A protein has these predicted regions:
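Flavin-dependent oxidoreductase catalytic cores
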Residues: 1-184
Length: 184
């Protein structure tokens, strides 16, 4: 809404702005069939999107019967929404509470410990998507399974530690762009 200033069939109303997304999904299904799993990532509270709009797109995606998973990039699964009218609810609760039938819900956002992963799964997510935790600990899922109190390494992490975790020099270089991620 805020960022899309188009005046053609892809701008203005939510229907128009969502049109490319639904056309792409329809094309993927047509070309790949039902045995091909399709997931869609949605990012509330980013890029001018409002929670009500994201919830509407989410519900429409489920209603199409053409997707298998919705991946909500929440940036911080534990925080309350910042948008007026939603600020008394956690983002995870806002989206886990939507009827999704057989569509799986994946969530990402500061899942740095086994406790945080348990929390989002307990709140209704089907899949916990870990990013930084898996970068700093390549075996994060196994470590969580073996130790219910496991948490990722403290940041910043020495570059050599990242290399020891399997990151290439190119990837370590990329991670240096993330403020406070690489120590040296």
């Amino acid at each position: 809404a805020e960022l899309n200033r188009r005046t053609d069939e892809f701008g203005g109303s939510l229907d128009n702005r969502a049109r490319p997304l639904f056309a792409i999904i329809e094309g993927i299904r047509r070309e790949c069939g039902n045995d091909f799993h399709v997931g869609v990532r949605l990012s509330p509270e980013r890029f001018g999107m409002k929670i009500d709009e994201i919830r509407e797109v989410y519900s429409r995606l489920v209603a199409t019967g053409q997707i298998d998973m919705i991946d909500m990039s929440l940036w911080d699964c534990a925080k309350n929404a910042i948008e007026e009218g939603w600020a008394d609810r956690r983002l995870i609760d806002i989206f886990a509470g939507i009827d999704r039938g057989t569509v799986r819900l994946a969530v990402a956002g500061k899942l740095y410990s086994a406790a945080a992963v348990r929390e989002v799964l307990g709140a209704g997510a089907d899949i916990a998507v870990v990013g930084r935790a898996a970068i700093t600990n390549h075996d994060f899922p196994r470590m969580m399974r073996d130790n219910p109190d496991f948490a990722m390494r403290e940041l910043p992490v020495p570059a050599q530690t990242l290399r020891d975790e399997g990151l290439s020099d190119t990837f370590v270089g990329y991670m240096r762009n993330w403020k406070g991620f690489v120590a040296d």
